[in-house]
Amino acid sequence: GTIISGQGANRAGVVVSAITTPTYAPIWDPENPQQFYNNFYGANLTSPRENMARTDYNQDVTDRLLLSGGLTFYLAKDLTFKSTVSMDRRWVHSSSFLDPIRTSYGRTQHGTASDTRSDDMRMIYDNILTWNKSFDRHSLEVMAGTSATTSVWEQLSGSRSYFSSTNNNAIPNLNGGNNGGVRGQSYGKSEWSIMSYLARVSYNYDSKYLVTANFRADGSSKLAPGHRWGYFPSFSAAWRISGEKFLRDVSWINDLKLRAGWGQTGNQAGLAEYGWMQQYSTNYYDWTLTENAQAVPTVGGRKNIKNQDLTWETSSQTNVGLDFA
């Protein structure tokens, strides 16, 4: 590492710190046995052990529940209806505590603790109606359906500082701190949903000539009003040449198929839930400093650049291929 202006080092992480820290540098301060040693020949040294101590009380726990179920109804000889529902739910609990004595950062914060709990649930509902019909050498399949996805995320966080240095680590959680009016709580919630309508028609003759047409319409709450719906068709055709009479007696060809297709797909991955809306930050005031017990939050600056033309990213693909086996 390189010492900069005698105030610190440009080291990052425990591994690099372990490599660059002199082996003869003391770990504990001789004058304060409960504190890690920092003053190494005028440099503000942070030992690897101190870096590790900052996370001694950190905990991260994730519980996940996956459920799915469905029903299939045979409405007629060639007509079926299938309805499925699935749920993916996660509960995350993260907590941290840094005592006010051992580490230099803990002393500047007078000890600090945080606790964050979040609940993330995603539901998917699918309903598909399928009609199959075969006659002579013809085979026809028609499918129509809907798919809906909803997602709700919620998070509550709290933090405290000013922990007792007399009874160190006695209460390593939020209850042991005293903020004295400093805001240390936050809450967040976001929701989004997608509604899709699906259709497909597939036809083949004698398993040699195959044609498929697909269409889907997707509407997303992440996109701006008036631009939320996208329409994406696709088509494909194939000719199984190996099924023709002039190749049936060729023993070294099991399958030979010429295929071609064109289609469009929509993408909204990476978009925030409310990117099309103008968002603002919130200013909070410490009433103990302003001497105003009635101090209330005010609207701050802009948090994003709104885009009221936000819509689907549409990509088109064309493919032609020859399958041989």
Each language-model region and where it sits:
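Extracellular/periplasmic, surface-exposed regions of secreted and cell-surface proteins
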Residues: G1-V16, N39-L98, T108-A325
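Accessory, often N-terminal, substrate/partner-engagement and coupling regions
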Residues: T21-P22
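Glycine-rich, aromatic-flanked loop segments that form ligand/cofactor-binding clefts
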Residues: A25-N32, A148-V152
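Amphipathic helix-loop-helix modules that constitute alpha-helical solenoid scaffolds
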Residues: E31, Y37-F40
